[in-house]
């Protein structure tokens, strides 16, 4: 078959217009290849067809920098969408949006490539059974249990710890469950991507992970497609290797933001708050593919940056509708020094029901939320009148709520270098036992500080014993 060659007619930033004089226009979403001898970083530039403009011209979005391109350069129609290298050869590697390795370890030696644009599994193929996934993080396992094969969102403003929780989960799940993890770094800090790579390497979990990066410095085309490349890698392990895969996306807001930039570059009229008019469609095409089938499951954890801490912004609001649970990180809790700064009253999970998690777990979780809600209601009275004006019953509620609040904190493995405290993985039964004891008043003799930054309840008791001895 003869090659379909076009010519560049216009370059405007990340937008490249290509003419195909023979009238053989490549379909929308086809990958085009440009050999750019003037670029050291991207000698082979991939562009994706976004629009047919008429007069045999297609408008494309570049997946890398367009410096060095000139009018009249040859453009090759590959005849297929962007293809991601999948399979065991991609484990332990870092790749970019077009599947090129960026870890300096040579080519990814695989013969299997899949297109990044694919249809979601059909209704008949999907599996709807639900079981909780243990993460080893107390506040999550107790109050916001993750469904296996579900989608959870981590909502929070800037600097409240979304990425640290994601990294801890990757670490815990790789060590405890031995599952395959795929991490999509979408429009986040390159330094964090580098840290994650080295930490996973040191922890020995890199061989069970694939990292796909399209960071802040990349053009919007790459940032709007990198999550699809990562998802394609995860789908292969679910469908062909019949495995349970974890897909981490940091950050889904940057995926939407990149889509908004691309939309503006293509001249579409913006909708609410300047977002793209196709916001719901763009997000749906990604989220609907993240699901469980009879072959295996993809469990997804997505960090969602909340612009100006406003949960009604169209980006987080649209994301909410796709999720099975929401983990809301609170700046007020972070200011108290309690990490992970999960808001126990704002966070929700679809599977926090007795028929999914069991009667004991459900009762303890609701008991914890009830006492924290009562404490929240009493805070105004305490601020105005002080603790002395409370009834004895309310004083007991406050003292237990403050112990629970501190016991919800936990030292993380990935933050050991910053905190100097060894990280702890807490089993679900230990978590339930600890909070059940606090609610029952078994640990009222311990001080609040004994519960701060410990793993299970035995660590809190040991802290109390040590303090008693040193007096």
Swiss-Prot record:
UniProtKB keywords: ATP synthesis, ATP-binding, Cell membrane, CF(1), Hydrogen ion transport, Ion transport, Membrane, Nucleotide-binding, Translocase, Transport
GO cellular component: plasma membrane; proton-transporting ATP synthase complex
Highest taxon in the source lineage: Bacteria
Annotated SMART domains: AAA
Subcellular location: Cell membrane
GO molecular function, one term: proton-transporting ATP synthase activity, rotational mechanism
Catalysed reaction equations from the record: ATP + H2O + 4 H(+)(in) = ADP + phosphate + 5 H(+)(out)
Topology term for the membrane: Peripheral membrane protein
UniProt binding sites for ATP: 156-163
Annotated CDD domains: ATP-synt_F1_beta_C, ATP-synt_F1_beta_N, F1-ATPase_beta_CD
Name of the top EC class for this enzyme: translocase
S-S pairs: none
PROSITE patterns: ATPASE_ALPHA_BETA
Pfam families: ATP-synt_ab, ATP-synt_ab_N, ATP-synt_VA_C
Enzyme Commission (EC) number: 7.1.2.2
Record InterPro entries: AAA+_ATPase (IPR003593), ATP-synt_VA_C (IPR055190), ATP_synth_F1_bsu (IPR005722), ATPase_a/bsu_AS (IPR020003), ATPase_alpha/beta_chains (IPR050053), ATPase_F1/V1/A1_a/bsu_N (IPR004100), ATPase_F1/V1/A1_a/bsu_N_sf (IPR036121), ATPase_F1/V1/A1_a/bsu_nucl-bd (IPR000194)
Oligomer and partners: F-type ATPases have 2 components, CF(1) - the catalytic core - and CF(0) - the membrane proton channel. CF(1) has five subunits: alpha(3), beta(3), gamma(1), delta(1), epsilon(1). CF(0) has three main subunits: a(1), b(2) and c(9-12). The alpha and beta chains form an alternating ring which encloses part of the gamma chain. CF(1) is attached to CF(0) by a central stalk formed by the gamma and epsilon chains, while a peripheral stalk is formed by the delta and b chains.
PANTHER family linked: ATP SYNTHASE, ATP SYNTHASE SUBUNIT BETA, MITOCHONDRIAL
Protein function: Produces ATP from ADP in the presence of a proton gradient across the membrane. The catalytic sites are hosted primarily by the beta subunits.
Family: Belongs to the ATPase alpha/beta chains family.
Cited HAMAP family: ATP_synth_beta_bact
Name of the protein in question: ATP synthase subunit beta
Species of provenance: Lawsonia intracellularis (strain PHE/MN1-00)
Source species taxonomy: Bacteria, Pseudomonadati, Thermodesulfobacteriota, Desulfovibrionia, Desulfovibrionales
């Amino acid at each position: 078959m003869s090659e379909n060659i076009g010519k560049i007619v216009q370059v405007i930033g990340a937008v490249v217009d290509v003419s195909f004089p023979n009238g053989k226009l490549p379909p929308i979403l086809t990958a085009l290849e440009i050999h750019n001898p003037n670029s050291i970083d991207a000698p082979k530039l991939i562009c994706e067809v976004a629009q047919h403009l008429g007069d045999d011209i297609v408008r494309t979005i570049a997946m890398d920098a367009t410096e060095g391109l000139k009018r009249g350069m040859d453009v090759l129609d590959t005849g297929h969408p962007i293809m991601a290298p999948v399979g065991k050869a991609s484990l332990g590697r870092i790749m970019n949006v077009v599947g090129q390795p960026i870890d300096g370890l040579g080519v990814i030696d695989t013969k299997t490539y899949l297109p990044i644009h694919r249809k979601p599994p059909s209704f008949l193929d999907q599996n709807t059974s639900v079981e909780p996934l243990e993460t080893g993080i107390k506040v999550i396992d107790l109050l916001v249990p993750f469904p296996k094969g579900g989608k959870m969102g981590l909502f929070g403003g800037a600097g409240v710890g979304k990425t640290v929780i994601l990294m801890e989960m990757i670490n815990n799940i790789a060590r405890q469950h031995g599952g395959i993890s795929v991490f999509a770094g979408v429009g986040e800090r390159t330094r964090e991507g580098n840290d994650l790579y080295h930490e996973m390497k040191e922890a020995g979990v890199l061989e069970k992970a694939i990292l796909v990066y399209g960071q802040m410095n990349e053009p919007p085309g790459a940032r709007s497609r990198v999550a699809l490349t990562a998802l394609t890698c995860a789908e292969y392990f679910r469908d062909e290797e019949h495995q349970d895969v974890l897909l981490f996306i940091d950050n889904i807001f940057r995926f939407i933001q990149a889509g908004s930039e691309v939309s503006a570059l293509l001249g579409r009229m913006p909708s609410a708050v300047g977002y793209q008019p196709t916001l719901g469609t763009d997000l749906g095409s990604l989220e609907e593919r993240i699901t469980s089938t009879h072959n295996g499951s993809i469990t997804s954890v997505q960090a969602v940056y909340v612009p100006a801490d406003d949960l009604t912004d169209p980006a987080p609001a649209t994301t909410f509708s796709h999720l099975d649970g929401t983990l809301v990180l609170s700046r007020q809790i972070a200011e108290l020094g309690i990490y992970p700064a999960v808001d126990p009253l704002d966070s929700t999970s679809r599977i926090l029901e007795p028929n999914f998690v069991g009667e004991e777990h459900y009762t303890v979780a609701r008991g914890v939320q009830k006492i924290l809600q009562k404490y929240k209601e009493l805070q105004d009275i305490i601020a105005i009148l002080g603790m002395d004006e409370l009834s004895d019953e309310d004083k007991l509620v406050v003292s237990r709520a403050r112990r629970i609040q501190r016991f919800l904190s936990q030292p993380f493995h990935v933050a050991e270098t910053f905190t100097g405290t060894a990280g702890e993985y807490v089993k679900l039964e230990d978590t339930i036992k600890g909070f059940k004891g606090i609610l029952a008043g078994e640990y009222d003799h311990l001080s609040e500080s004994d519960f701060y930054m410990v793993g299970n309840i035995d660590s809190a008791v040991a802290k109390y014993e040590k303090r008693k001895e040193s007096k």
